[in-house]
Amino acid sequence: MPAHLDAIDWKILKEMQDDGRITNVELARRVGISAPPCLRRVRALEEAGFIKGYRAVLDEKLLGYEVTVFAMVHLTSQAEPDLKAFEDFVRKEPLVRECWMLSGEIDFVLKCVAPDLKTFQAFVAELTGAPHVRNVKTSLTLRNSKDEAIVPLPAK
């Protein structure tokens, strides 16, 4: 798949992002091509990495995760092995939903969920004791005004 996407590819990406459960037949109808070439295009988009995967979006509150917290982490070292060690630690933590390395004063920001504050406090104690962690500052969320797991696509 070339890096250049044509208008049909963009339509496929938009439709699939809007509804990941769409059938190939319906997708083909919406983008204006027949089913076999539509499926070939979807496979090519997957192989090229434009489509990274498929999953259900779950409601964490209904599943008992009442607390969402952002943790700002400062490390004692920014040497690449130390950064990788911290990232490896975070990948193993089920309460961490996202981990972003930043430029500036904060090295990493983590988006975490927990069933309650006591569970999150226990995680913070573990996080603070992780290798190369200088300090951790947290901010408890009050509400979420926007949560879209989509990529803005240009109108084609």
Residue ranges of predicted features:
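A compositional/biophysical signature of low hydrophobicity enriched in polar/charged and small residues
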Residues: M1-K156
